[in-house]
Amino acid sequence: QFEWAIHHPLALAAGTARETLDDLAVGRWPCSMSADESAAWDFTREVLDHHGVCDATYADAVGRWGEQGVVELTALIGYFVCVCWVMNVARTPAPGAPEGGPLKPFPG
């Protein structure tokens, strides 16, 4: 919840479509993402669900961002997972839910 509360307004300010954030807020697959956002989302979900990615996902990511970009995205995913684990264990309170309320669990 902390990361959602902090990053929701930043995502809006960076140009993420409100519809994308609304979908995420209720646990729906975001439908209004750009091609790059969608590729990053697919890559991230695959890493989180399977602890790796298939050859097609990897090839698409390398084609978009290069090998360095794929390493950076993977490191970013790992960093945020680790931060969230620590914050969950420490029961870090969110600084207040963004508009739309707290993030719902994503169906997995």
Predicted segment positions?
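Hydrophobic alpha-helical segments
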Residues: Q1-G108
